[in-house]
Amino acid sequence: MLETWLTRTLGVTVPLLGAPMGGRAGGRLAGEVTRAGGLGLIGAARYNTPQWLAAESAVARELGGGLLGFGLMTWSLAADDSLLDAVLAERPRVVSLSFGDPAPYVPRVHAAGALAISQINTIEDLRIVEAAGVDAVVAQGHEAGGHTGRIGTLPLLQEVLESTSLPVLAAGGIASGRGLAAVLAAGAEGALVGTALLASPETVGPEYARDRLVAASSTDTVYTDVFDRARHQPWPARWGGRALTNDYTAEWHGRGADEETLAAAYDGNDPRLGVVYAGEAAGLVREQRPAGEIVRDIATRAEELLRRFG
């Protein structure tokens, strides 16, 4: 068993969180990650409703035995924080408040009996979330799928580990037992894993996304803002999103087109023109596999590798 701060604090057996991927990580995915020994986080995106959260929470709770976690986009709560209320009503164990200053919301998370964690992309982010009183941080590197920063996982992880007394998890490019073993050996308390789970049948979202990920290599991603602009998603400019390349990115990435032009060309139902957010570990996803099987394999292989040196 891989014992860390994360496993001891949550009472889980695998030091792994399933990433709260908006539009992809619902109750089935989260529940299966939890049932396999980690903790799956439901992605509470700004377009989700309290009714959707309640329904997905019930699924995750039944599959995972009651343990729940969620991830929210902190910047979106400034205009409307009712989604946080809906999350806390589900009595989660962990709430991830990322991409912005969580200070206004951490006390509410703690009052609800949950741990507050934050993904960070720079040391400046670290100082902000430390001041906010979070319980742990996730050093998320540029390799990660979806929205992320611009520093690679290993450089960022090392700097964060040397700069804080908070428990630190790692995210970005971790899609196998080798990846988990590497960050644990570096001093992380666990990993946040997303891309490795994206081809699992438990994900929500378009069917073509799983097929495209399995067919992709690790060179088939691009860090871009065109999909946010095409869908009128008001993400702060400092966070682009890593997605699989397709005809749409070939035509529009880096072109400087206006939102109306980008929106007119976008079609989320067409794999050539829709978005599939995924990280540089895409080349490690070679088939569609159940999420629980993936989590168990990652844990087993990481333990085998670490035992060689322990």
Report each predicted region and the residues it spans.
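Residue-level detector of alpha-helix initiation sites
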Residues: R24, I174-A175
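Conserved active-site-proximal phosphate/metal-binding subdomains
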Residues: T153-S165, L169, A175-G310
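Active-site entrance/lid segments in N-terminal catalytic domains of soluble metabolic enzymes
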Residues: M1-P167
